[in-house]
Swiss-Prot record:
<keyword id="KW-0813">Transport</keyword>
<keyword id="KW-0249">Electron transport</keyword>
<dbReference type="GO" id="GO:0005506">
    <property type="term" value="F:iron ion binding"/>
</dbReference>
<dbReference type="Pfam" id="PF00283">
    <property type="entry name" value="Cytochrom_B559"/>
</dbReference>
<dbReference type="InterPro" id="IPR013081">
    <property type="entry name" value="PSII_cyt_b559_N"/>
</dbReference>
<keyword id="KW-0479">Metal-binding</keyword>
<feature type="binding site" description="axial binding residue">
    <location>
        <position position="18"/>
    </location>
    <ligand>
        <name>heme</name>
    </ligand>
</feature>
<comment type="function">
    <text>This b-type cytochrome is tightly associated with the reaction center of photosystem II (PSII). PSII is a light-driven water:plastoquinone oxidoreductase that uses light energy to abstract electrons from H(2)O, generating O(2) and a proton gradient subsequently used for ATP formation. It consists of a core antenna complex that captures photons, and an electron transfer chain that converts photonic excitation into a charge separation.</text>
</comment>
<dbReference type="GO" id="GO:0009535">
    <property type="term" value="C:chloroplast thylakoid membrane"/>
</dbReference>
<protein>
    <recommendedName>
        <fullName>Cytochrome b559 subunit beta</fullName>
    </recommendedName>
</protein>
<keyword id="KW-0793">Thylakoid</keyword>
<dbReference type="GO" id="GO:0009055">
    <property type="term" value="F:electron transfer activity"/>
</dbReference>
<keyword id="KW-1133">Transmembrane helix</keyword>
<keyword id="KW-0408">Iron</keyword>
<dbReference type="GO" id="GO:0009539">
    <property type="term" value="C:photosystem II reaction center"/>
</dbReference>
<comment type="subunit">
    <text>Heterodimer of an alpha subunit and a beta subunit. PSII is composed of 1 copy each of membrane proteins PsbA, PsbB, PsbC, PsbD, PsbE, PsbF, PsbH, PsbI, PsbJ, PsbK, PsbL, PsbM, PsbT, PsbX, PsbY, PsbZ, Psb30/Ycf12, at least 3 peripheral proteins of the oxygen-evolving complex and a large number of cofactors. It forms dimeric complexes.</text>
</comment>
<dbReference type="GO" id="GO:0020037">
    <property type="term" value="F:heme binding"/>
</dbReference>
Length: 39
């Protein structure tokens, strides 16, 4: 049952990475867009 024990850890890690990466990329993208539009 090593797969059942490894799968939740991989899922939590995947959710944590995407949960931090997606808002960060969207935040940086919106800031760069605001800077570009102002100029």
């Amino acid at each position: 049952m090593t797969i059942d024990r490894t799968y939740p850890i991989f899922t939590v890690r995947w959710l944590a990475i995407h949960g931090l990466a997606v808002p960060t990329v969207f935040f940086l993208g919106s800031i760069s867009a605001m800077q570009f539009i102002q100029r």
